Curated annotation (Swiss-Prot):
Protein name, as recorded: Ornithine carbamoyltransferase
Recorded name of the encoding gene: argI
Lineage of source species: Bacteria, Pseudomonadati, Pseudomonadota, Gammaproteobacteria, Enterobacterales
Cystine pairs: none
Pathways involved: Amino-acid biosynthesis; L-arginine biosynthesis; L-arginine from L-ornithine and carbamoyl phosphate: step 1/3
Family assignment from sequence similarity: Belongs to the aspartate/ornithine carbamoyltransferase superfamily. OTCase family.
Length: 334
């Protein structure tokens, strides 16, 4: 894919609708080739650096397996495995790694960090997650949606995101809707809406591409006719305990449960989640939530919905690897 060669992958709005579609087509082909045993290694001899200032299961495994499948080698630099930002600036780190590696993945904090890496590295840089955007996740989501509704184009699909929409997932969903023409509905309390400027920009683009973007606090109105309902965690272990109570009180009414799924009026509605999910008390945080806030059946999603036939979250998780592979192949091979 010569049009992508040596490009960065930092946020979705850096691309056109046609470019996004070609990445999804490549991901689908790579997935089919892997499953049929016909995959051709395009990245043999390439060296890839994986910078993780925030730990991850899916992102790390996806990049590593995708790289190995394609014949590349990886170096993992974890939260304590480099001098980035401590003894060496991002700018200097970029210039060092760019001399040794063919591509660099960054998962961490501010978007300005991955932008600086891209400016100075001289090799493709990929955003594995920042505070502001999570573009590789949305690629996986879009591929999963295509697979489960093959008879519809994106501008015939309705995607609902319920919960805290002011985070990197909300922002990247706005950008995805802008490029694909999805009917995107962010169903959340006003305190959890994304920045107005990004909403305005993405809504205008979405409408040009045959879709729309709606923000509402009304759950029943927001989920009506949805093809997919998506949510993400409400709290994380790194946050102060006082924040937990505040966030849970704010978002309780936006939990994805069987009632919300029924309110769609669509018996075929599917459930999406970028994972990890607090749907039971089998994790340290899930157990704390159950004990302190009575959330025994799940937090942002009930265990009933998570384990139901409507849940396609593990298809999503698998597709992280196929779509990340597409990004690497597109940007590192001519």
């Amino acid at each position: 894919m010569s049009g992508f060669y040596h490009k960065h992958f930092l946020k979705l709005l850096d691309f056109t609708p046609a470019e996004l579609n070609s990445l999804l087509q490549l991901a689908a082909k790579l997935k089919a080739d892997k499953k049929s045993g016909k995959e051709e290694a395009k990245l043999t001899g390439k060296n890839i650096a994986l910078i993780f200032e925030k730990d991850s299961t899916r992102t790390r495994c996806s990049f590593e397996v995708a790289a190995y499948d394609q014949g590349a080698r990886v170096t993992y630099l974890g939260p304590s495995g480099s001098q980035i930002g401590h003894k060496e600036s991002i700018k200097d780190t970029a210039r060092v790694l760019g001399r040794m590696y063919d591509g660099i993945q960054y998962r961490g904090y501010g978007q300005e960090i991955v932008e600086t890496l891209a400016e100075y590295a001289g090799v493709p840089v990929w955003n594995g997650l920042t505070n502001e955007f999570h573009p590789t996740q949305l690629l996986a989501d879009l591929l999963t949606m295509q697979e489960h509704l093959p008879g519809k184009t994106f501008n015939e699909m309705t995607l609902v995101y319920a919960g805290d929409a002011r985070n990197n997932m909300g922002n990247s969903m706005l950008e995805a809707a802008a490029l694909t023409g999805l009917d995107l509905r962010l169903v959340a309390p006003k305190a959890c809406w994304p920045e107005a400027a990004l909403v305005t920009e993405c809504r205008a683009l979405a409408q040009q591409n045959g879709g729309d973007i709606t923000l509402t606090e009304d759950v029943a109105k927001g989920v009506e006719g949805a093809d997919f309902i998506y949510t993400d965690v409400w709290v994380s272990m790194g946050e102060a305990k006082e924040k937990w109570a505040e966030r849970i009180a704010l978002l309780r009414d936006y939990q994805v449960n069987s009632k919300m799924m029924q309110l769609t009026g669509n018996p075929e509605v599917k459930f999406l989640h970028c994972l990890p999910a607090f749907h039971d008390d089998q994790t340290t945080l899930g157990k704390k939530m159950a004990e302190e806030f009575g959330l025994h059946g799940g937090m942002e999603v009930t265990d009933e919905v998570f384990e139901s036939a409507a849940s396609i979250v593990f298809d999503q998780a698998e597709n992280r690897m196929h779509t990340i592979k597409a990004v690497m192949v597109a940007t590192l091979s001519k």
